[in-house]
Amino acid sequence: MESEKEVAQVREVSMVKPNYMLMSLQRILVLTVILAGVLVVVHYTPMPEEYFENCDRECHELDWPMICRVKLVIEVYKTLSKSCGSCTEKDGGDCPATCISADGRERGVLVANRALPSPTLHVCHNDILVVDVVHRAPAHALSIHWRGQPQKETPFMDGAPMLTQCPQPAYTTFQYKFRASAVGTHMYHAHSAADAADGLAGAFVVRQSARLDPIKALYDVDASEHTIYVSEWGHSMGPLAGVISRIPNAESLLINGKGKSSESPDAPQSSFNVEYGKRYRFRLAYGGGSKSCPIIFSIDHHVLEVVTLDGHQIEPQRVNSVELGRGERVDFIVDAKKVPGVYKIRVAAVKSCQDNLEGVANLVYEDKKQKVLHKDDDKVDAEVSRELTTVTSDRCESDNVVCLTEIHAATKLPVELTENLDKTIYVPFNYSTRQISAKRVESWGQTDGHRFTYPASPLLTQGGDVGANQFCTKEPGQGDECVHVKHIPLGATVELVMFDQGGESDHIFHLHGYSFHVVGMRELHRSFDSETIKKMNEEGTLFNKNLVDPVEKDTIVVPKFGVVALRFKADNPGFWMMRDERSSHWTRGLDFILKVGEQSDFVQAPPDFPKCGSYVGPEYFLI
Ligand SMILES: *[C@@H]1O[C@H](CO)[C@@H](O)[C@H](O)[C@H]1NC(C)=O
């Protein structure tokens, strides 16, 4: 009996006391192994690209257009962040992709996806872009302009604040959705020039099927890595800096976000690789910066065969250098046929705007099997000694300088734009600075006597909220501040004659929604009044117009005391800004708006389109 009891007890004891310690250790071990396995698998699984649905591909005319999803996270960031280490110093190693080296100096940057310049977008013609702008930079009201895209189906996606949309407040997301309908090398940038100069700008390339490209025979390679974005770099402009009359000098020119300064001569430079014997199509966009001086671009010992301007094809021009104003783009072809090596790509600001403002990059011949070189390969192109410039000046008379008026478009001026135009609009503008005391300079900017100001609500999407008293009068003003709108009937053929009365410097204007044919351009060397200009234009003594094959552009450099005549057919209804590109922030008074068509002609924004106007205007009291 007793022994039975004992046995039972022993059994009980052994059942009651399993080894808990060991069991939990085993479980922990098993769980750890599983967890480690999961981590290994996750670690080695390639993550889908977070920001881009990559539309950078070979374009084919029979392919369906793609939907290109882009997420642009806008932040205040800095150059030389931790990840850079000492990569901008001598023997500091390569800079990691996450490092913004700029010109090797520390500075705040306004970035999209922590990149400088903003990531280049490559799409095919007719792709649909869906761009989420996630705005995380306090104190900036943003809108992004897609330069070069007419936005005919979606005028409310043009990114002009208070015209086509309410500027986006910080900590919100705005979705741009539009069709890339205009082929060519373009740009996208913050509407505010200060924000663009602080980094929020990049290249935007719309390619077409090689079979549809009329100049395909001229090149072998059109690759995304041969896109060049040049920008001015210097002191941050900040929202208030734009208000001062004297803009500080820029300090360097960056090529694809890289350059050097005297302080850091070892900062990395951009390189563009080529193989001997191939012809490369390069795409160049100049985004400007705080000062936005015109720049001269060249590649040592290489000829640039310029084939497009602002995305429009021209009769090819073989030149040694190209001079561009802010916002202009060119495509050129480089025949890589020099003694393989490294050649300098140079940009320099025009001296009359700022001396000693330069940037460099490298053209690198990849070390593939070297071809036998003919001794005179180097000489062939030395015969070319010409410059192409979009900036008209006295130099145009020289045989070695090809100016805009001497360049021929690849296509003829449409017949309806050759004569009997429906409307001619004369637009005098005057930007002048005056020394008002030994220390102070004051500036005035007016177009037609009106100082441009933005309306309180976006004209296209909330036009009804804008009081009639905010608009400028039709007659020339007396320096009044108002919303300057010029009305054009839908479908009219238009000639816009713009002329500079101030004579301070060149001026650059960019038209949204259209590109125009530059039928006339000239320096007048002094101020003329509207009556005289009108008379001269009607008599045909103002210019020797090119009504056969003038170049087509969307950005124009109006020479100092100069006049230009721009023609287009007003077939894109909406509110389109003629933007003064030298403005360092939102405006300095020279901008104006073209209202094409009537409210009923406008493509309506979707009903849930974000709106301005929950704030009570300053003239109301809540109590
Ligand atoms: C341009 O503006 C300045 C400053 O307001 C003025 O002194 C000058 O007379 C103007 N020039 C013309 C041609 O209107």
Regions found by a protein language model. Name each.
Residues 98-125, 259-273, 461-493:
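N-terminal edge beta-strand
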